[in-house]
């Protein structure tokens, strides 16, 4: 790892985080429901893009952090864009406000749809 690698990951992470913030804010202005739609759509779209680009970039999953494009785009931008921690916070809020079953359903749906989106993105890239 070099200083330039750290710079690319940090720059990508900043870009991804800003995209997540802007998209989440935009969705929140339009959607006023109880479902955490912003986090859901951000994570699903991120899963799709990472599935697609991982094939396009020929990612070797045993050494997926070494290449500059992987570091800047997959780890940096998409790592900053997607948000596991916000999904967990949303689930905790759902559990308090609407019950544990709703929260568990949200987590299960998020994971399954995310896996399907990543697989679909990878399939499209082949």
Swiss-Prot record:
GO molecular function: fluoride channel activity; metal ion binding
Pfam families for this protein: CRCB
Residues that bind Na(+): 79, 82
Regulation: Na(+) is not transported, but it plays an essential structural role and its presence is essential for fluoride channel function.
Catalytic activity: fluoride(in) = fluoride(out)
Subcellular location: Cell inner membrane
Gene Ontology biological-process entries: cellular detoxification of fluoride
Recorded GO CC terms: plasma membrane
Bilayer disposition of the protein: Multi-pass membrane protein
Residue spans crossing the bilayer: 7-27, 37-57, 65-85, 101-121
Keywords annotated in UniProt: Cell inner membrane, Cell membrane, Ion channel, Ion transport, Membrane, Metal-binding, Sodium, Transmembrane, Transmembrane helix, Transport
Function as written in the Swiss-Prot or TrEMBL entry: Fluoride-specific ion channel. Important for reducing fluoride concentration in the cell, thus reducing its toxicity.
Annotated family: Belongs to the fluoride channel Fluc/FEX (TC 1.A.43) family.
PANTHER family per UniProt: FLUORIDE EXPORT PROTEIN 1-RELATED, FLUORIDE-SPECIFIC ION CHANNEL FLUC
Protein name, per record: Fluoride-specific ion channel FluC 2
Organism of derivation: Yersinia pseudotuberculosis serotype I (strain IP32953)
């Amino acid at each position: 790892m070099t200083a330039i690698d750290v710079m690319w990951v940090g720059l990508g992470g900043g870009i991804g985080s800003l995209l997540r913030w802007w998209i989440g804010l935009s969705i929140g202005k339009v959607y006023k429901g109880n479902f955490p739609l912003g986090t859901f759509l951000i994570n699903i779209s991120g899963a799709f893009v990472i599935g697609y680009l991982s094939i396009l970039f020929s990612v070797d999953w045993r050494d997926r952090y070494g290449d500059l494009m992987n570091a800047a785009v997959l780890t940096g931008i998409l790592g900053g864009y997607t948000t596991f921690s916000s999904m967990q916070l949303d689930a905790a809020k759902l559990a308090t406000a609407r019950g544990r079953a709703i929260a568990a359903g949200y987590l299960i749906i998020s994971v399954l749809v995310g896996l399907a989106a990543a697989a679909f993105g990878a399939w499209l890239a082949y």
